[in-house]
A protein has these predicted regions:
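Conserved Switch II/interswitch segment of TRAFAC-class P-loop GTPases
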Residues: 22-23, 59, 94-97, 292-313, ...
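Short alpha-helix plus adjacent loop in nuclease-associated cores
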Residues: 117-138
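Switch II of P-loop NTPase G domains
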Residues: 2-5, 31-34, 57-74, 251, ...
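Switch I (effector-binding) loop of TRAFAC-class P-loop GTPase G-domains
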Residues: 2, 210-213, 234-264, 273-283, ...
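Conserved catalytic network of the ASCE P-loop NTPase/AAA+ motor domain
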Residues: 8-9, 77-84, 256-260, 265, ...
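Switch/connector loops and helix/strand junctions flanking conserved nucleotide-binding motifs
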Residues: 24-27, 58-62, 97-102, 119-122, ...
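C-terminal-of-GTPase-core extension/linker across diverse P-loop GTPases
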Residues: 1-16, 37, 148-226, 232, ...
Length: 418
């Protein structure tokens, strides 16, 4: 099996499909599809159409009902007649091997689900050997129960011509591109090798963490694309890659930061996202160890996002799942410069909702109860950054006195790094 060769994605057109269910209303489904569209664009695809259907639960055979599947098929056929080829259909939930096989048989195009799309972006973003190894293992975990479908799919894609070089397309990056006769034993052997490699990396990183000295560890956590890397750059005065795309950060970056006379370690971690299976998150153990071993979590939230409260829940649940819950935390509401609200007309007598609240009114809701553990900033416009430094400094100092009460360097003179 060859190592990853990260490929440049050609522009492919994509159709999105989501469900409106008892547990997921239309507003939430549209919000999820907005995120799925952003994921598709990050992977290099152009979204041209969306389909939704109301069902109690997903159809176990074809995800959507037969009538909706036929509607999607007719749309693809019409586009082909107009010489506008649809490259793929992306579903907003993880599909079973049976569902993928049945849907492909009907639509005759590439079928992706949310998980495979996210893994494809991981493959694009991975830069270090550690990240590439983690991504490869995660992709094999996803691939293993879908092997039979993968063979058929890759043969349709053109087998020998779809190698892992420059021609890789959305959903086909990483392993599985060149060996169509891959079987379960080969994959399991490869996974064992990758796990051994990651175990060795874990040991190396654990040793590195032990050698960092007696300093408080602070980890930036949050949903993907909320501005963690920009905040990292402001606090550490270093250049960590920051981009307005999902999963711009995949490798954990650790920097020594000094505020006033107090040095501490600050790490920027991979962003979390909804509907990502825990067993795939587990592939990123060495990366997430920075979160597990942190003394303080700085939870960054994009307050301009309409679903920011649900994103907070996703992050908190993921933290609990990986063993990072229950730690001291500061909640940072970023992007206040981008916050918008819907102003009601004077004669509108309907009850006000969250969408009608100004930022000042929103700040007086449940967030007000958090007092010093909550801060509102704009990292891009550098609004309230001094206040952010003050809050982080106070919390780090409190933790340092508790953890290292006899550490002399608290009384030494340090200067903030230029």
């Amino acid at each position: 099996m060859k190592e990853f060769i990260i490929s440049e994605a050609k522009v492919e057109t994509a159709v999105l499909v989501g469900l409106i269910t008892q547990m997921q209303d239309e507003r939430k489904t549209n919000e999820y599809l907005d995120e799925l569209a952003f994921l598709a664009e990050t992977a290099g695809a152009e979204v041209v159409k969306r389909f939704t259907q109301k069902l109690p639960t997903a159809n176990s055979v074809t995800y959507v009902g037969k009538g909706k599947l036929e509607e999607i098929r007719q749309y693809i056929r019409t586009e082909e007649e107009e010489e506008r080829e649809v490259g793929m259909v992306i579903f907003d939930d993880e599909l079973s091997a049976k569902q993928i096989r049945n849907i492909e048989a009907e639509l005759k195009v590439k079928i992706l689900d949310r998980t495979s799309l996210i893994l494809d972006i991981f493959a694009m973003r991975a830069q270090t050997a550690n990240a590439k190894t983690q991504v490869e293992l995660a992709q094999y975990k996803y691939m293993l129960p879908r092997l039979q479908r993968l063979w058929t799919h890759l043969e349709r894609q053109g087998g020998s011509g779809s190698g892992s070089g420059k021609g890789g397309s959305v959903g086909l990056r990483g392993p599985g591109e060149t060996q169509l006769e891959m079987d379960r034993r080969i994959i399991l052997n490869r996974m064992s090798l990758l796990k051994e490699r990651l175990a060795e990396i874990d040991k190396q990183k654990a040793t590195q963490r032990k050698n960092r000295g007696r300093m408080i560890r602070v980890a930036l956590v949050g949903y993907t694309n909320v501005g963690k890397s920009t905040i990292m750059n402001l606090l550490s005065k270093s250049e960590v890659f920051a981009e307005n795309k999902l999963f711009a950060t995949l490798d954990t970056t650790v920097r020594k930061v000094i505020i006033d006379n107090l040095p501490f370690l600050l790490s920027d971690t991979v962003g979390f996202i909804r509907k990502l299976p825990t067993d795939l998150v587990d592939s990123f153990k060495s990366t997430l160890d920075e979160v597990r071993e942190a003394d303080l979590l700085v939870h960054v939230v994009d307050i301009s996002h309409p679903g920011f409260e649900e994103q907070i829940e996703v992050v908190n649940k993921t933290l609990a799942d990986i063993g990072g819950g229950g730690k001291p935390m500061i909640l940072i509401f970023n992007k206040i410069d981008a916050y918008t609200y819907v102003e009601k007309a004077p004669d509108d007598l309907t009850p006000r909702t969250k969408e009608n609240l100004t930022l000042e009114e929103l700040m007086k809701t449940w967030m007000a109860k958090m007092e010093d553990n909550c801060l509102f900033i704009s990292a891009r416009e550098r609004i309230n950054i001094d206040e952010l430094k003050d809050v982080v400094y106070q919390r780090v100092k409190e933790l340092h006195v508790q953890k290292y009460p006899y550490n002399d360097f608290l009384y030494q003179t340090y200067e903030e790094e230029e």
